[in-house]
Amino acid sequence: NSFDSVLITDATKAGKIIYANKAFNRLTGFGVKEVVGKTPRILQGPATDKKVLERLSKALQGGKRFEGSAINYRKNGNPFIMHWRVVPVKVEKNTKVWIAIQREGTAVE
């Protein structure tokens, strides 16, 4: 029962969503069953800062954590500012996932 939105993706280049909590649903309007198997790109749109996404991608490819914020979009198409922190977590010997903790913000940092 987290206040923050939690999204877990596989650590492959595709980064498919394997888990989302109820706070993700409240934040974005997307149901958990709607997003599992998709990528977080479903939240991106025309005003999403591509430079932030490039920094995110570079950090993840290097196995590093990332913190950032950007304009994302709810299921209904309304834009909002999302702040997020993504960390790599090893769950088995050779298996890693990315855990993203997200919350709505008032300004892009």
What are these model-derived regions, one by one?
Residues 15-18:
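Conserved hydrophobic beta-strand signature of PAS-family and PAS-like sensory domains
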Residues 4, 66-68, 75, 80-84:
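PAS and PAS-like sensory/regulatory domains
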Residues 24-35:
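PAS/PAS-like sensory domain cap-loop motif
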Residues 36-47:
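PAS-family sensory/regulatory domains
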Residues 6-8:
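Short hydrophobic secondary-structure edge segments in sensory/regulatory modules of signaling proteins
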Residues 49-50, 59-69, 82:
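PAS/PAS-like sensory domains
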Residues 84-108:
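Short loop/turn elements at sensory-signaling interfaces that couple input to output
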Residues 11, 71-77, 90:
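PAS-family sensory domains
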